[in-house]
Amino acid sequence: MAEKFSLSKFFGMNDEYDDDYAEEPTPATKSTPTPPTRPNDSRKVVAMRTAKPNASHIAICEPRIYSDAKSIAKQLTNGDAVIVNFARVDEAQAQRIVDFLNGTAYAVGGEIKRIGEQIFLCTPHNFEVSGDVAANLGTQVTR
């Protein structure tokens, strides 16, 4: 039993404290509830960028080599429409780039349309293109 008392002292369980003490009651204090604070309504100017968070973006690209198709496809997968001008690329490279972008447009649910002699419009799924410019490509206006 002596070991029991020494272990209890070791763990701080000593019987030498007084259980018979009277606690004085503390007076009850009335606290008034604070009304909820309202945000400061003095900000009456709203930035234009916050007013249109879903603004559409159209990029214009003029590739020179086939590897430029990767950056065009990146913009298309990010949800931007891209106008691509193939004036500085030979016909074989332009065909390869169009094939690559056609696959990218299909993957994102978009489309690619020819809007000029060497100009294409690549759009993701959230763009709607109306009208047909390709039918008028053969007739050019002379002055």
Swiss-Prot record:
Subcellular location: Cytoplasm
Function: Cell division protein that is part of the divisome complex and is recruited early to the Z-ring. Probably stimulates Z-ring formation, perhaps through the cross-linking of FtsZ protofilaments. Its function overlaps with FtsA.
Annotated GO CC locations: cytoplasm
Source organism per UniProt: Levilactobacillus brevis (strain ATCC 367 / BCRC 12310 / CIP 105137 / JCM 1170 / LMG 11437 / NCIMB 947 / NCTC 947)
Homology family: Belongs to the SepF family.
Pfam families: SepF
InterPro entries listed in its UniProt record: Cell_div_SepF, Cell_div_SepF/SepF-rel, SepF-like_sf
Assembly with partners or alone: Homodimer. Interacts with FtsZ.
One of the protein's GO biological processes: division septum assembly
Keywords: Cell cycle, Cell division, Cytoplasm, Septation
GN (gene name): sepF
Stretch list, region Disordered: 16-43
Protein name: Cell division protein SepF
